[in-house]
Regions:
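Short, charged/polar surface micro-motifs in flexible loops or helix N-caps
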Residues: 10-15, 23-24, 69, 89-93, ...
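Conserved Nudix-box catalytic region and its N-terminal flanking loop in Nudix hydrolases
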Residues: 14-53
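Active-site segment of metal-dependent pyrophosphate-handling enzymes
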Residues: 51, 55-92
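NUDIX/MutT-family hydrolases
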Residues: 83-87, 94-126
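Short beta-strand micro-motifs in enzyme catalytic cores
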Residues: 3, 77-86, 103, 130-132, ...
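Conserved N-terminal beta-strand and adjoining loop/helix that marks the start
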Residues: 1-17, 37-40, 83, 89
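Acidic-enriched and Gly/Ser
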Residues: 128-207
Length: 210
C-alpha cells in the first residue's frame, strides 16, 4: 500500500503547482503538486494536508479520483506515491510549511518546469487522462448534468457508450463547470452531440481539453 500521495488541485481550467522551500531535505526549490505522507484512502487526512499547506478550507474542496501509486526516487529511497485529483472553488493560496510559493498553470505546461519532483507531469496524466471538463452557463450546471444523465439512461443511439462513461460530477461550488469521467474523448464528444449525426448537440456547452 502507498504511504504517500501527491495532490493535483484544479480550479476551473488551471492546476496548482507548489514550489518547495529552499531548506527542505528533498528537492529544495523544486516544483511539486501537494505532497503528503500517509494513507491516500484517508480523504479527511488528505484534505487536511491541502489546508495545511495552502490555506484552502475543506468546504472549498472536492475529491475527483486517484491513480495507481508510482515508485519515485527520493535520493537513495524509493517511495510509493499515489497521485490524487481534487477540484477547488477558490484560487487564493497561502503557501506554507513545505512550500514557499505557488503558481496556477495550464495543465499542458506542467512538464515545462525545469526543476520539478520526479514524474510530476506523468502523475498528473494518471489522474487527468480520463477526465473531461465541460463549460456551460453559470446557473445551468445541474440542468446540464441531468440532461447528460438522461441521455445515458436511454435506450437509443447512446446505449453503446453507457459503459464508457464512468461518472458525471457537478461540484456545487464550481459554477459553470461539469466534469465527465470517460474512457476516451470521442465518447464524451458523442454524448454531447459534437460528433456523428444521431445525437442532438447540447446547447451552451463547450468541451475543454486538458
Amino acid at each position: 500500500m502507498s504511504d504517500a500521495f501527491t495532490i493535483y488541485l484544479r480550479n476551473e481550467e488551471s492546476v496548482l503547482l507548489m514550489q518547495r522551500a529552499d531548506g527542505v531535505a528533498d528537492f529544495p526549490g523544486a516544483w511539486d503538486g501537494i505532497y503528503g505522507i500517509g494513507d491516500p484512502e484517508d480523504l479527511d487526512a488528505v484534505v487536511a494536508r491541502i489546508t495545511e499547506v495552502t490555506g484552502i478550507e475543506a468546504e472549498n474542496l472536492q475529491f475527483v479520483r486517484s491513480g495507481d501509486a508510482r515508485g519515485l526516487a527520493f535520493g537513495n529511497r524509493l517511495n510509493d506515491v499515489t497521485p490524487m485529483l481534487f477540484v477547488s472553488s477558490v484560487n487564493e493560496v497561502d503557501a506554507r510549511g513545505l512550500y514557499k510559493s505557488f503558481e496556477w498553470v495550464d495543465p499542458g505546461n506542467i512538464g515545462t518546469k525545469e526543476y520539478a519532483t520526479p514524474q510530476l507531469s506523468d502523475m498528473y496524466g494518471d489522474v487527468a487522462s480520463y477526465l473531461y471538463i465541460l463549460k456551460t452557463s453559470i446557473g445551468q450546471e445541474q440542468n446540464v448534468a441531468k440532461e447528460i444523465q438522461a441521455r445515458l439512461s436511454g435506450t437509443g443511439s447512446l446505449k453503446d457508450i453507457q459503459d464508457e462513461i464512468y461518472g458525471v460530477l457537478s461540484p456545487h461550488f464550481m459554477r459553470g463547470y461539469i466534469f465527465v469521467e470517460a474512457s476516451a474523448l470521442h465518447h464524451v464528444e458523442k454524448l454531447i452531440g459534437r460528433v456523428g449525426v444521431s445525437t442532438t448537440p447540447m446547447k451552451n456547452l463547450s468541451l475543454i481539453h486538458i
